[in-house]
Amino acid sequence: NNLKYLKWSYDSIRKNQGNHEVEICVADDFSNDGTWDWCLEMMNKDPLFKAIRNEGPTRLGHTILYDRLVNEAATNDICMIYHADMYLMPGSIDEIEKHLTDKTIVSLTRIEPPLHPDGPEKILFDCGIEPEEFHEETLMSYLQMSSKDRSNKTTEGIFAPWAFYKKD
C-alpha cells in the first residue's frame, strides 16, 4: 500500500542508475491500493521490472518477501534491498560496487527528515516527506556541499538500502 512512493522510487532508480543495467524486483504483500495492477503494467513496459505477489489474505511481511525476491525473481549478481519510499542518488550504484566484497553487506547512507531518532547510518536533513513535497535540488545542493566530509567514510550502522552478492 505504498503505490505513490513506489512510483517515485522507481523513477529515481531509472533516472540515477547511470550506466548500470538495474533489475527492479518488487514484492506486493496483498496490497489494495492498485500496486499490483501497476506492477503488472510495469512488467509489460520494462523488461527489467519483475514482481511477485502474496495473494493473502494474511500478509507475509518484509523478511519472507525479501527472501522470495532474491531467490525467485532476481537474476543479477548484486541484490539490493530497497524500500518503496527511498530515492536513489546519482552515483549510489558505483559506490556499492566500489565497497562490496564477498560475504559483506554494503548499506548506503540514508538522508531523511527528522522523524525518527538519529543514528550512524543516516543524516537528518529535510527535503520533504511526501513524493510531491520532495525537493531534489535542495538534496543535490546539500550533497555537493557536504560530499568532501563524507568521502569514503564508513560506519557500522546498517539499515536499508543495503546490497549484497546473491550467491552469499
Per-range role (PLM):
Residues 13, 29-30, 57:
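Conserved short acidic donor-positioning loop in nucleotide-sugar-dependent glycosyltransferases
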Residues 89-167:
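Conserved catalytic core of nucleotide-sugar-dependent glycosyltransferases
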Residues 55-74:
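Glycine-rich, basic loop-to-helix element that forms the pyrophosphate-binding segment
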Residues 79:
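Short aromatic/hydrophobic "clamp" motif used to bind/position activated sugar donors
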Residues 1-8, 30:
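Active-site beta-to-alpha loop of glycosyltransferases that engages the nucleotide-sugar donor
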Residues 83-87:
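The conserved acidic donor/metal-binding loop of glycosyltransferases
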Residues 28-37:
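A conserved acidic beta->alpha catalytic loop
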Residues 11-21:
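Short, acidic, metal-binding catalytic loop of nucleotide-sugar glycosyltransferases
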